[in-house]
């Protein structure tokens, strides 16, 4: 049976998050299929609490090419429900697998993109700094990357 690269990416994300935040809470939400092709009713893949006072709602996405269309992020509307809640950071960890780069895009930044009429999230948006997209420091290891998610907390976590 072929390995789904996106699911394998989620496993790699889990390993890297736990390495970065060894004493943190991390919960993988089971996919609850809604009846639509490959669409879960959950707002995200993971609930993560690194111990810095913030709860992360993280959707993991793997995509080939230099951009991902919003149509490939069906969780957008559900994540948007958590925008602006104190202590909650909702967003997408995006691995552009052809480019070997990993990014964090908050739901607030995604909402700005949609309001600006954007149809996708692209590498160019990061490079020209038109939106606050955070690149996750990552090192290539064969197929996958070792990523350092502490950049999302500015290194702040409880001991």
Which residues does each predicted region cover?
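Charged phosphate-binding loop/patch that engages nucleotide di/tri-phosphates or the phosphate backbone
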Residues: 123-159
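Active-site-adjacent loop/helix micro-motif of nuclease/hydrolase catalytic cores
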Residues: 38, 56, 64-76
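Beta-rich catalytic cores
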Residues: 42
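Nucleic-acid nuclease catalytic cores
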Residues: 83-112
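Acidic-basic catalytic patches of nuclease active cores, encompassing PD-(D/E)XK
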Residues: 1-37, 156-157
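Short, electropositive alpha-helical surface patch
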Residues: 108-125
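Conserved catalytic cores of phosphodiester-cleaving nucleases, focusing on short active-site segments
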Residues: 46-48, 52-65
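Sequence/structural signature of beta-propeller domains
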Residues: 69, 105-109, 150, 154-157
């Amino acid at each position: 049976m072929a390995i789904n690269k996106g699911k394998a990416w989620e496993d790699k994300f889990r390993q890297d998050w736990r390495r970065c935040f060894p004493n943190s809470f991390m919960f993988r939400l089971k996919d609850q299929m809604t009846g639509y092709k490959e669409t879960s009713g959950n707002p995200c893949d993971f609930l993560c609490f690194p111990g810095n006072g913030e709860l992360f709602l993280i959707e993991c996405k793997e995509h080939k090419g230099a951009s991902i269309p919003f149509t490939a992020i069906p969780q957008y509307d559900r994540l948007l429900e958590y925008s602006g809640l104190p202590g909650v950071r909702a967003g997408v960890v995006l691995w552009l697998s052809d480019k070997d780069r990993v990014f964090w895009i908050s739901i607030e930044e995604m909402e700005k993109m949609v309001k600006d009429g954007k149809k996708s999230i692209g590498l160019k948006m990061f490079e020209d700094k038109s939106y606050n997209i955070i690149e996750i420091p990552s090192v290539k290891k064969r197929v996958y990357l070792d990523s350092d998610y502490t950049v999302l907390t500015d290194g702040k976590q409880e001991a």
